[in-house]
Structures are given as structure tokens and as C-alpha cells.
Amino acid sequence: MKVSDLHIKFKLSLALTIFVTTFLSAQLSRTHYIPPITTAANSNATPQNQYLHISTPSITPVNVEVNDLGNVISNYTVSNANPLEIYVGFGDNTSFVVPSSNIESEISNKGFIIQSEKPVYVSLRLVAGNQNQAGSLVSKGLSGLGN
């Protein structure tokens, strides 16, 4: 194998590694916006327990501020050994779930804004339909906002 072939393979490997690394960290951000969702009317999958999950690859503790747009701002600390799980609520009228009868209204008191001093991962999970179904919303952070 020629040196020039090895050089080209090295450059391609390096480019692929950078490309993959960029996408793997796309969910890692210092700011996350979690919008509310709604349920189907007359559904057998009524939302039940809902949890906000926050984690980080950081070994050192990271301060996190969770702004529940309907209530208060709460401060927490997370690390890679101590992720955070916050109980959001139960049913179809919580900070995360909007009743289907309200979807045509302007809603300004639902959803979350999560801010941290170092990058964190954020997801919101719920169980529905007598514990038989589950769903998850994973925040892409600021990279999810586009250009």
C-alpha cells in the first residue's frame, strides 16, 4: 500500500470521526426547551406518570435550573454518577401535557426551559394507558433550533 493511500484513508477516517462525534453530542446542550404535548380525545392512552430526566457526562457536579413555565424555577445539581429524575405530574393537564380541548388556545404556562452551566442531556418520559404504553421526548438543545 502506498503512503498516499494511507494518507487518504487517514484523512477520511478523521473526517468521519469528526462528523460522527458532532452528531453524537447534538443532544448535549446548556439550554433546552421542552414544549408541551397534547393527547388524543377519547383515547385509551391517557397520560399518567411523567418524569423529566437530566444527565451529564461531566464527572464534576453541574448546576441546573429548571424553569417550569406554569410554576416555579428550581435549582438542582447533576453529575454523570448522579442523574436527576423530576416527577412532573399525572394526567392530561400538567406542565408537559395539555388537554386536547385546549390545543386551539394560546398556551404560555406549559413546558420547560432547562439551563445549566455545563452541557446536559434532557428527556421527558411518560407512561400512559394503564401502564401499557410509554413515550419519550428527547431535547436536542440549542442545536434543535436550527440556524
Residue ranges and their predicted role:
Residues 1-30:
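Bacterial Sec-dependent N-terminal signal peptides
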Residues 27-147:
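Intrinsically disordered, low-complexity linker/terminal regions across diverse proteins
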